[in-house]
Swiss-Prot record:
This is Phospho-N-acetylmuramoyl-pentapeptide-transferase. The gene is mraY. It comes from Chlamydia abortus (strain DSM 27085 / S26/3). Belongs to the glycosyltransferase 4 family. MraY subfamily. One of its GO terms (molecular function) is UDP-N-acetylmuramoyl-L-alanyl-D-glutamyl-meso-2,6-diaminopimelyl-D-alanyl-D-alanine:undecaprenyl-phosphate transferase activity. Its main location: membrane. Keywords: Cell cycle, Cell division, Cell inner membrane, Cell membrane, Cell shape, Cell wall biogenesis/degradation, Magnesium, Membrane, Metal-binding, Peptidoglycan synthesis, Transferase, Transmembrane, Transmembrane helix. Coiled coil: none annotated. CDD domains: GT_MraY. It is found in: Cell inner membrane.
């Protein structure tokens, strides 16, 4: 990619071009992907035996194809190879995170398809693989940033950069934080993907928030490349909503949700915005937090906090329609995005 594209006056035009191509490609490839998934009988097999009411509410979703996240995989991979130079380490780092996260999700979707009750690989297996992928990405980022001031700092919302010190202990702390940020985001998006359009719409807002952080972080080594990946994610997410809004023609499955979470978490690590992601992705945090609290409460108190978890199912259980739940969560996601951007730009 010609570095001239990143002159200040042409940045917006360039990113709009990236967005437009990703969006058009997503719209164009959407129907062929859905047809292909139907031919391979990639339908949602997961049974909600933990909640009979949800089983009834989602009865009409049984014959909706899943693993539509392959659309994200295709568009994101084509985007980075089209716009970024093959000789740059960042290009191959992006390719690795796209391929690895989508492959893990695809494998999980395949296992779900083959099992009678639609359960994928075990939580332990998935967690170990997520840790390995995230560790590789974090190691690569730390290698790229070694020797720069960013190697020793952490961005804290409203307070700016905070020094981690030059000790090995500080770097070990950051490594653990970064790995957990990527793994946590992957799982949080995965948990959010339970209603038509919910995860894709929330992704648009979180990706836009991180994009603002990226284009204003001129001192970060990867700041010229990260916007390309985030803009492409924003474009394909909006395109996917055409097929995923209620009534959904396709679900993203783990192929899409883990890939999206992996991209958002990895970009946050590259931008040193791990803590900021908690604000920008507040809906994802709330969804994951509701599951953690529910499990902890059932284990130690023998009581449920929510009628059903993740949080969006709690509201469904209370009688709120699916479309209303999605609209409210999108609204919450918008305010989280605005608050996160303010926190990022606060000096």
């Amino acid at each position: 990619m010609n570095s001239g594209f990143y002159l200040h006056e042409s940045l917006v035009f360039f990113l709009l071009t990236v967005f437009a191509l990703a969006f058009i490609l997503g719209i164009f490839l959407g129907k062929p992907v859905i047809r292909w998934l139907k031919k391979r009988n990639h339908y949602d097999q997961v049974q909600k035996e933990y909640c009979e009411k949800l089983e009834v509410l989602h009865q009409d979703k049984k014959y909706t194809p899943t693993a539509g996240g392959i659309l994200f995989f295709i568009v994101l991979l084509l985007t980075i190879f089209f716009w970024l130079p093959l000789g740059k380490l960042s290009t191959w780092l992006f390719a690795f995170l796209i391929i690895s996260w989508s492959s893990l999700g695809w494998y999980d979707d395949i296992v779900k398809k083959r099992k009678k009750k639609g359960h994928g690989i075990s939580a332990k297996q998935k967690f170990v693989l997520q840790l390995l992928i995230s560790a590789v990405i974090t190691t690569a980022v730390m290698y790229i940033y070694k020797g720069t001031s960013l190697f020793y700092t952490l961005r804290v919302p409203f307070f700016g950069s905070v020094s981690l010190g030059h000790s090995v202990l500080g770097q070990v702390f950051y490594f653990i934080l970064a790995v957990l940020a990527i793994v946590g985001t992957g799982n949080a998006v995965n948990l959010t993907d339970g209603l038509d359009g919910l995860a894709a719409g929330t992704t648009c807002m979180c990706a836009f928030g991180l994009l603002v952080v990226a284009v204003t972080s001129t001192t970060i080594p990867l700041a010229t490349d990260i916007p390309v990946l985030l803009t492409a994610l924003l474009g394909v997410s909006l395109a996917f909503l055409k097929y995923n809004c209620s009534p959904a023609q396709v679900f993203m499955g783990d192929t899409g949700s883990l890939l999206i979470g992996g991209v958002l978490g990895s970009c946050a690590v590259m931008l040193r915005a791990e803590l900021l992601l908690i604000l920008l992705g507040g809906v994802f945090v709330a969804e994951a937090g509701s599951v953690i609290l529910q499990i902890a409460s059932c284990r130690f108190r023998k009581k449920r906090i929510f009628l059903c978890s993740p949080l969006h199912h709690h509201y469904e259980y209370k009688g709120v329609s699916e479309t209303q739940v999605v609209k409210r969560f999108w609204t919450a996601g918008f305010f989280c995005m605005v608050f996160g951007i303010i926190a990022a730009l606060w000096r």
